[in-house]
Amino acid sequence: MKRLGFLFLASILLLPNAAPAQVASPAPAASAPAEAAGVVRETLANGLRVIVLPNKLAPVATTYVSYGVGSDDDTMPGIAHATEHMLFRGTSDVSGGQLADIAARMGAEYNAFTTDEYTLYYYKFPAAYADVVLHLEADRMANAAIRAQDWATERGAIEQEIRAQESRPLHAVSMKLRERFFAGTPFATASAGTVPSFEKMTADDIRAFYRAWYKPSNATLIVAGDVDPQRTLADVHRHFDAIPAGEVPGRKPIEVPPLASSSLEEPIDFPVGVGVLAYRQPGSNDADYAASRVLAQVFSSGRGALADLTATGKTLGVLSFTNQYPEMGAGFLLAIPARGSTPQAAQSLLSGVLDDYRTNGVPTELIDAARTRLLSEQAYQQSSISGLGLAWADANAQHRTPDAVYAAIANVTADDVNRVLRTYYTADHRLSIVLTPKPSSTVPKTDPSAGVEHVGFTPTMHEPLPAWAQSALKAPLHPPSGEIGARPHRLANGMRYAVRRETAAPTVVVSGVIRTSPLLYEPKGKDGVHLLVDALLPWGTTTYDRKGYEAQLDAIAASAALGESFALKVQAKDFERGIALLADGMLHPAFAPSAFAIVRANTMQSVALADKLPKTKAELAQRLALYPPGDPRRRDVTEQTIAASSLDDAKRWYRFAFRPDETTLAIVGDVAPERADAAIRKYFGAWKAAGAPPSFRFPQLRAKAKQAQTVTVKVPTNVQSEVTLKQVFPMRRDDADYVPLLLANTMLSGEGTGSLLMEELRTHRGYVYTADSDFNVNAAGAEFSISFSSDPKNVGRANAAVVAMIKRLQSAPLSAVELQRAKALLLAQRVLPLDSYAGVAADMLAGVKDGYTESDESWFWNALLRTTPGQIQHALRRIDADHFVRVIVEPGS
């Protein structure tokens, strides 16, 4: 499905740490409540701050370890970032390979990121392994090895990461923007580092930085999830007490000079221009920080004047987002001009909205709704174990608790919001940016010595685990236990739904999906009419117009998404009203001609722009190479097919595709099944289907002549080459090879740095920063792919290494240990997403779009646990390693 992603645009446009303001937030809380019951906090004798957040939603836990050091403290450009990388390369007690193996055996997800002010490491894992993770984090804090030979290889990987950032179309202009907007502060430079800085950096430099900053007195440990607080504290003491407190260097104070008004106009190698206004905001240490958050929420309101710019067809899209630092904040407004307009005109529209707000004040009803929605986030944090832990980590970075953050928001007045607007959002203190589309004909130059293979490095092999880890991980694998799903119900009209009662938060999540197939049933020459229907639904119902519907959601601080996939987030006390609004949006769309005209024009422009993106060109070329002429999977949505679709076509598609007997709902949260049942029957029971249900059977994939194909897409601004290898073949999920291929895919890419692809392409050879594989079976058949990004000179080497690896796996069975890791990961992947109401709902809907519901059937888990190395070897022979369809998006013109 083609859509121009505005959040994607923002992510590649400006600055790291951008936090888009949300149009709608979860359910409300009238005021910020006292600190959540059960929270335990303690500071160890060595200064380590510990926060334990018990939450019994699922047998899952997360840990966050936040160190008070970031790129602001760099002694060399990027050294904080490099230290983060090297702390995954092992310690004096646990090698990098063992670290990856332990995580895989637990089925854990883990990663880290470096910001300007702090570095955060996190694990998400089955809660039974909490002690193992605490052991690993204590070891990382005290004993990181940071060996020269490891840095020699990791340098290549981190340089690939930097090159990936440099390949973004707007990287160069974002650096100019940073330099001007943050002039005189550490934020003005690229926090991730540069290739030249990493070439100069040594392991000794990194080790010295680590020893200076990685101290318990400079760290906070957060444990959230299904844990016993007192037992967890005892384990923390056992693992961390012996680490000396140490002293850390003093942090340099950051002075923020005033921002003088200036303009920046730059050409960009992107298919659309953008008008941007950038303003300074209060930092998180400022008394007006809470008011600035409320103002940012107002900017993203669906009832606000910024949203009206798109609703009236004046812009293709508008986005507001912020960057926050203790000393200062940054607020950005972006507008993409509608067809026939210019970035300058779009920017003037943004300025006009701000002028009106400054003159007349921000509407009080929008301020009230924004404040209530922000306060509602506290209730929803309780509905997600990971979200709860991350909220505390974020608040900790601001040196406060979430309760203090919400208490400040609760006290924000309309006068506060208007004062912040009139003080900070002024023409005298803003950066005005106009980005004009202009395709580049210049291929960036790269350092030929950077990111090369370090042939002297001895590859790390999987090793026996330390005795303590072997003991902790010796328990045999078992299928998930307990009631993961819920018993389905069916209305007389055929609609299916299931309810799972959870009481971790006073909120409810409703997720729904309608099984449709535009590829099979959209009229020829009108591909994409389903996009028009999905885009039209939020424009109002026969009961409420667009703003009226948004106002009804605001009244209960609920959020609703409408379309073939639809959802509701609502406070439990307002469940019936939320269901009524959801049903009204899905069953009674207005389909106003005026709205259709704007939606079609915007969709035509979005599709036309998306068609110019290299990724879109690559995906289309790959589909055409994979499927034979006449196959529906070759169909493509274009500007012309959208233009050919009328309002009557949209109405016909809605009547054909939106039918109760192809609809499934999952309801998760603090609502009794009887209450949910009554509401669903009341508001969805009268929905009727038109005609017989459609068939979703695709043409059988036929074996094609064996011929390896390579398609190349040139991008002048790319620094790296992005490579995808793909094959398709007939398969159903009840095929004997399905589960073995799932396990094979998990071994290839599911184990993080310990996966087969990452070990071969990154750890051993330094060709890539990341590599991935994917295996998917749906109603159309099976798809298997491998993807990676590398310097152009390494594409052939990396490709050859991938082919050789597949052939090795086909010729010799994997070890029992490798298979055990893959099984543990797949089992954990079943459990870890259940750490939130939304994750439980998604699990309950798994496979519905493709007509499968095996996620709740015991046969799948029995098949997984019985799979042998020989079965995986046999199943992998379905892959023809010499005949992938390969697409390369590479530098060039």
What do the PLM-derived regions correspond to, one by one?
Residues 5-16:
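Bacterial N-terminal signal peptides
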Residues 62-124, 190-192, 300-315, 327, ...:
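M16/MPP (pitrilysin/insulinase) zinc-metallopeptidase core fold and M16-derived inactive scaffolds
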Residues 90, 133, 165-215, 236, ...:
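Scaffold signal of the M16-like zinc-metallopeptidase fold and its non-catalytic homologs
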Residues 104, 145-163, 228, 247-261, ...:
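Acidic/histidine-enriched alpha-helical segments
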Residues 276-278, 299-337, 385-388, 724-728, ...:
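A structural supersecondary motif
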Residues 18-51, 228-267, 273, 280, ...:
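Proteolytic maturation boundary segments
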Residues 89, 93, 124-155, 233, ...:
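M16/insulysin-pitrilysin zinc metalloprotease superfamily fold
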Residues 47, 65, 81-83, 103, ...:
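Buried hydrophobic packing residues in well-ordered domains
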